[in-house]
Amino acid sequence: MARLRIINFYRSAYCSAMSEFRLPGEGEILGKVIEMLGDGRFKVICADGQIRVARLPGRLRRRLWLKAGDYVIVALWDFDREKGDIVHKYEKRDVEELKRRGFAEAIEALDSYA
């Protein structure tokens, strides 16, 4: 019974976080996963054309499954702009919403890079 409560707690927290539409904020950039490196690290091509190594934080490792071709938000590190953390994954329907909200050029650029 207690285990079910814990599972439902994490499921509700994950679903509520994923239901809100999120745009890249200050210090964040839109990216596309191009390669899985292992150990929670991914090679991501960002909207500015740079290829960065981004890691998936431990709090998201079991909740967020990524594969090549997924669109993500990368929070760049302050001390090393060549690396960052993946903080959000966009679903397929969210990519269409991104295009409607003015990120169509960035998505087309990411598709042309990859």
From Swiss-Prot:
Pfam families reported for this sequence: eIF-1a (PF01176)
One GO CC term on file: cytoplasm
Record carries keyword Cell membrane: no
GO terms of molecular function: RNA binding; translation initiation factor activity
Any one GO biological process: translational initiation
SMART domains: eIF1a
UniProt keywords, alphabetically: Initiation factor, Protein biosynthesis
Superkingdom of origin: Archaea
Domain S1-like, first and last residues per copy: 19-91
Protein family: Belongs to the eIF-1A family.
Its biological purpose: Seems to be required for maximal rate of protein biosynthesis. Enhances ribosome dissociation into subunits and stabilizes the binding of the initiator Met-tRNA(I) to 40 S ribosomal subunits.
Protein name, per record: Translation initiation factor 1A
Organism (species): Pyrobaculum aerophilum (strain ATCC 51768 / DSM 7523 / JCM 9630 / CIP 104966 / NBRC 100827 / IM2)
Name of the gene encoding the protein in the UniProt record: eIF1A
